[in-house]
Every structure is written in C-alpha cells, then in structure tokens.
Amino acid sequence: MESRVLSRTTAIAALPKLFRPSREAASFGFATGVKTPVGLVKDGGSLTWGRQLRPVLLLEPVQTGPVCSRREKTAVQPCRAASGSSGEAKTGFLEKYPALVTGSFFFMWYFLNVIFNILNKKIYNYFPYPYFVSVIHLFVGVVYCLASWSVGLPKRAPMDSKLLKLLIPVAVCHAIGHVTSNVSFAAVAVSFTHTIKALEPFFNAAASQFVLGQSIPITLWLSLAPVVIGVSMASLTELSFNWLGFISAMISNVSFTYRSLYSKKAMTDMDSTNIYAYISIIALFVCLPPAIIVEGPQLMKHGFNDAIAKVGLTKFISDLFWVGMFYHLYNQLATNTLERVAPLTHAVGNVLKRVFVIGFSIIAFGNKISTQTAIGTSIAIAGVALYSLIKAKMEEEKRQMKST
C-alpha cells in the first residue's frame, strides 16, 4: 500500500506543473513579469491555460511586456519575411535601377527644351524683345511655383538667412545667364547659339579646378580640345553670325557654370524643387529692372501693338504663357537632374541636349548651314562624346578602388 502511494506521488511529481496566468495575460496572450523556474521549462515546460494541452516553451528568461512564445515566434517569422520581401519588390525597383530614373530625367529635360527653343524663337520672329520675354519666362514659373506651394505639391520649405545668402549668387547667375541666352537666341539662329553654348563643359572644368580646387586630369582637358575647335570652326562660317549673339552666348556659359557649382552647394540644405522655386523668385526681381529700363519705352510705344497686329492678342498671350511654362518645367527637370549627378556630368548632358535642339531647330526653321559649320558642330559633339567616355571610365575606376 505504501509503495503504491509512493508510486502515485512520484508519478504526479513527474507531471508538468500548470501555471494559471493573470487575466490580462490570458486574454491577450502576453507574458507577465513573473519569473518562471528554469527547471520547469527544462522538465517539460509550462502549459498555456485553457484548452491547449500541449506544452509551450517560454522564452528564457521571460521579459516584461508583450513577448511571443517560441512556438508563436517560429510561426510568425515566415510571414514577416514574406511581407518584407513583398515590400522590397514594390519599393525597390527604382532603387535597383537608378540609371533608369536618371535617364528619364534627361529625356524629359531634352524633350521640353526642344519645344521651348522652337516656340521661343517663333516668338522672337514677331516680338524681338528678349529682356521682356525673359521676365515672362520667370513670371510664369513663379506663378506656377506659388500655385504648387498652395496645394502642397511640393510642400514649401522654409527660408532662412543662411540659405538666402547661398541662393542670391545662384539666382543672380541664373538671371544673367537667362537674359544673355535670350539675347543670343533673338540675335542669331538657335542652332548657332547652342553650338557656342556647347563650350559649357570647358567652363565647368575650368571652374571646378580653379574655383573649387578640384583636380581635373590632363586627359579630360585634352578631350575638350575638339569641342573648342569644333565651335570655332562653326562660328567662322555661320551665316547668321553677329557679335551680339556670340558674346551673349559666351556670357551665358560663364553664368550658368557658376550657377551649377553654387546650386550643388545649396542642395545640401533643401530639395532641388524648392531651391529652383526660390531661385526663380529672386531672379525675377533681378531681371525686372533691366527689362523696364532697356525695353520699356519701346514696348509701350509700339512693341505690344506690333505683336498683336501680327498674330492677334489671343495667340500672343498664349505663346507667352506656354513658352514660360516650358521654360520653367525644363529648368526644373534640369535642376532635379543636377541633384542626381555631378556638375561636370550635368554639363555633358547639357551639351548632348543641344544635339537634339540643334537638329530639331534646323528642321523646324529650315536654317541653312554651311559645310564647315556642319563639320565644326559635328567635331564639337564628337569631343563631348569623347569627354563623356573618359569621365565615365575614371568614375568607374574610382568606384572599383573604393570597393576594394
């Protein structure tokens, strides 16, 4: 009898002990802060209170707060991994292919620029007032920015005195480059202006080395030589050549070079969309006084009346509005592209854009060009292509050295 009692006692002692959790833990499945004897877990584990009869091993040690059991943890992990992989599939495409995004920026930049240049030159054919048209370009862009800010697309970034000091020289360079470019567009053929402005990589390289102190390899300098030679050949035999158009295009090269360099510095504090919006506002105030002084009297006397008499009031206003919209949008995309690439790469892309503009402008306006001008333009474009290949190869070598 005694042995039978002892055997029952031993059998009962060998069974796993049951722990009734608190009501809060039982209802939500959360572990409490009560310490569980490690020996009980080792012997067979604790049983979750209720209908579940199989032992569930608790984590060792048990933490306070919501902690899942090992059984629950192993059951949840695959779902969590699947969810994560699904999220990566949805959001990781653009991150996996950044070159595709940058390429789309370049394409839209080129497309809008071609439309702008064709419409802009058509306006100058019946309304030759580049200072006033430059103001209209910026004014339409500023109205667009204010309307976008009012609906939160994008959200307006606050302006402080430090950033304002950075943006003022950028806006001044932008205003000077914009006005001088339009003076050149009004004076000579669009194709010739863009041929002169193909020298922008040369000015960017010079500014990067002598202003920013960056070392430019001799091979890059040599690759820019065909660009200079080609532009010189094209200039000597350009049928629409005049010094006003040539000098204005050269001044715009210098101005836009400094704009690119200082814009890159300013982007550390604000996104490119808001930066260009503030630049447009400041540049508008910079361009307005010269337009009033230089062209104001002529516009009031006969400029507006002549344009309305030639094309009508509706078309005149419509042309000014759309040329301003295309100008703002293509410059906004150019600024967004600059945010993704280095200034020199941006300059090269700018020159390749001119290939499209030159080609489409010749087709649209039927401009006659001499054989030497065509050869010079081709040499300049080939020089830019050579420069791009050398620059890309150097950047790839730098990335490989950093990875090793």
Curated annotation (Swiss-Prot):
For the keyword Nuclease, the answer is: no
UniProt-listed GO biological process terms? transmembrane transport
Show which residues sit on the Chloroplast intermembrane side of the membrane: 75-98, 153-209, 295-372
Residue ranges of the TM segments? 99-119, 132-152, 210-230, 275-294, 373-393
Organism of provenance: Spinacia oleracea (Spinach)
Q: How does it sit in the membrane?
A: Multi-pass membrane protein
Q: Which InterPro entries match?
A: Sugar_P_trans_dom (IPR004853), Tpt_PEP_transl (IPR004696), TPT_transporter (IPR050186)
Q: Which portion of the chain is the transit peptide? A: 1-74
Q: Where in the cell is it found?
A: Plastid, Chloroplast membrane
Which residue ranges does the entry give as Lumenal-facing topology? 120-131, 231-274, 394-404
Regarding how it is modified after translation, the entry says: The N-terminus is blocked.
Q: What does this protein do?
A: Mediates the export of fixed carbons from the chloroplasts into the cytosol in the form of triose phosphates.
GO MF assignments: antiporter activity; organophosphate ester transmembrane transporter activity; phosphoglycerate transmembrane transporter activity
Q: What's this protein's name?
A: Triose phosphate/phosphate translocator, chloroplastic
Family per record? Belongs to the TPT transporter family. TPT (TC 2.A.7.9) subfamily.
One Pfam family here: TPT
Keyword Transmembrane helix listed? The answer is yes
- Main site of residence? plastid
The Gene Ontology CC terms held by the record are: chloroplast membrane; Golgi apparatus
Q: Write out the entry's keywords from A to Z.
A: Chloroplast, Membrane, Plastid, Transit peptide, Transmembrane, Transmembrane helix, Transport
